[in-house]
């Protein structure tokens, strides 16, 4: 039987259509996925992301452990509350998960990992933490609400205490702070400003209702997917998985190659891939009628005249742009155009960087 978050009842009261998402009953939409998408791009929307897993790590060697566990380097984290995005890789350089790490003190770091990968993540972390004597606490006592959009921070702040408002005032992106009952982070999955707010489970329903009263629109998984795709953000299981390198998933920027003597899981495999060459993740835009969908083939002719083929990893109609967009994993050497086979039609597409919308504006 699928699990329910502490906000399940609130979703049904808001008229949600509930679906099973990796073993969790989650809202797909509350009537109109399109309206929810536009609310986040133009005003403020909120998502229940309590199905994600918060993991607290304590111990004097926590930083040392994370420098080995992750491809990005937590040595970069020197300011309290600063966050870092990283892949957690296997020995062959495949992505076990992508996650966010927060630094609080030398013996306290926090991870936020995906729901679909929860069990294997916890198993992997526990297995590798043992030699470092790390105390691992899974925070199932916390709910997580993402409030996103150009007016999201202002509307969310109406629920904060004076102390909380003061703590987040002017806080830069990718920081988090614990004030009272709330852990407030300037992170998100939409390409808009906003907060991801963790709170005790018993406080979540009241907080959700207060956000509704403050004019924040409840949004479901459907809008979350179109928003993240417009923003060029990866979805685990589509853009990357245990058989796909971060180098082939537009995550090269998350690999800290320096210092050269830092050993991290997957480093040797990545160095070989970097030397040999690898696939790349690109954006595709199709302004003609039709929708680019996952797993459609992408064909092009390289500079040497060879026929090459890749695959769409995520595709949709973009509500913000009014045409179809996609992320595709393709062999290196793709030019500015390609062909996508949609049923029995060969459709021309423009090849772009893998990002389409930032802060409500087109960038593709």
From Swiss-Prot:
Cleaved signal peptide residues: none
Recorded GO CC terms: cytosol; glycine cleavage complex
Keyword Transferase part of the UniProt annotation: yes
Enzyme class: transferase
InterPro entries: GCS_T, GCS_T_bac, GCST_C, GCV_T_N, GcvT/YgfZ/DmdA, GcvT/YgfZ_C, TrmE/GcvT_dom1
Coiled coil segments of this chain: none
GO function terms (MF aspect): aminomethyltransferase activity; transaminase activity
Catalytic activity reported: N(6)-[(R)-S(8)-aminomethyldihydrolipoyl]-L-lysyl-[protein] + (6S)-5,6,7,8-tetrahydrofolate = N(6)-[(R)-dihydrolipoyl]-L-lysyl-[protein] + (6R)-5,10-methylene-5,6,7,8-tetrahydrofolate + NH4(+)
Any one Pfam family match given in the protein's UniProt record, by short name: GCV_T
EC numbers, comma separated: 2.1.2.10
Statement: the UniProt record of this protein carries the keyword Transmembrane: no
Any one GO BP annotation for this protein: glycine decarboxylation via glycine cleavage system
Keywords: Aminotransferase, Transferase
Family membership noted in the UniProt record: Belongs to the GcvT family.
Subunit structure, as described in the record: The glycine cleavage system is composed of four proteins: P, T, L and H.
Purpose of the protein: The glycine cleavage system catalyzes the degradation of glycine.
Protein name, per record: Aminomethyltransferase
UniProt organism field: Salmonella enteritidis PT4 (strain P125109)
Taxon lineage: Bacteria, Pseudomonadati, Pseudomonadota, Gammaproteobacteria, Enterobacterales
């Amino acid at each position: 039987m699928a699990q329910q978050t502490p906000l399940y009842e609130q979703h049904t009261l808001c008229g949600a259509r509930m679906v099973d998402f990796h073993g969790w009953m989650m809202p797909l939409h509350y009537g109109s996925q399109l309206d929810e998408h536009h609310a986040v791009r133009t005003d403020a929307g909120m998502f229940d992301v309590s199905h994600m897993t918060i993991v607290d790590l304590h111990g004097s060697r926590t930083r040392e452990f994370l420098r080995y566990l992750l491809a990005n380097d937590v040595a970069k984290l020197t300011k309290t509350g600063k966050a870092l995005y990283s892949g957690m890789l296997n020995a062959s350089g495949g992505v076990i998960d992508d996650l966010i790490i927060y630094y609080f003190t030398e013996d306290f770091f926090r991870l936020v990992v995906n729901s679909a990968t929860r069990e294997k993540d916890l198993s992997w972390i526990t297995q590798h933490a043992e030699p470092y004597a790390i105390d691992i606490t899974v925070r199932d006592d916390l709910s997580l609400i993402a409030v996103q959009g150009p007016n999201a921070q202002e509307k969310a702040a109406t629920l904060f205490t004076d102390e909380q408002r003061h703590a987040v005032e002017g806080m830069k992106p990718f920081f988090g702070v614990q004030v009272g009952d709330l852990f407030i982070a300037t992170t998100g999955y939409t390409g808009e400003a906003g907060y991801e707010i963790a709170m005790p489970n018993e406080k979540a329903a009241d907080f959700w209702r207060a956000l509704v009263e403050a004019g924040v629109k409840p949004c479901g998984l459907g809008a979350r997917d179109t928003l993240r795709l417009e923003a060029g953000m990866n979805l685990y299981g589509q853009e990357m998985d245990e058989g796909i390198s971060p180098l082939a998933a537009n995550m090269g920027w998350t690999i800290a190659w320096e210092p050269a003597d830092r050993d991290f899981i997957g480093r040797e495999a990545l160095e070989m891939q970097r030397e040999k060459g690898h696939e790349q993740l690109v954006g595709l835009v199709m302004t003609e009628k039709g929708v680019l969908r996952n797993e459609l083939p992408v064909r092009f002719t390289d500079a040497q005249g060879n026929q090459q083929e890749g695959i769409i990893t995520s595709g949709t109609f973009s509500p913000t742009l009014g045409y179809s967009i996609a992320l595709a994993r393709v062999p290196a050497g793709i030019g500015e155009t390609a062909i996508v086979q949609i049923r029995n039609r060969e459709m021309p597409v423009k090849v772009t960087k893998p990002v389409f919308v930032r802060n409500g504006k087109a960038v593709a």
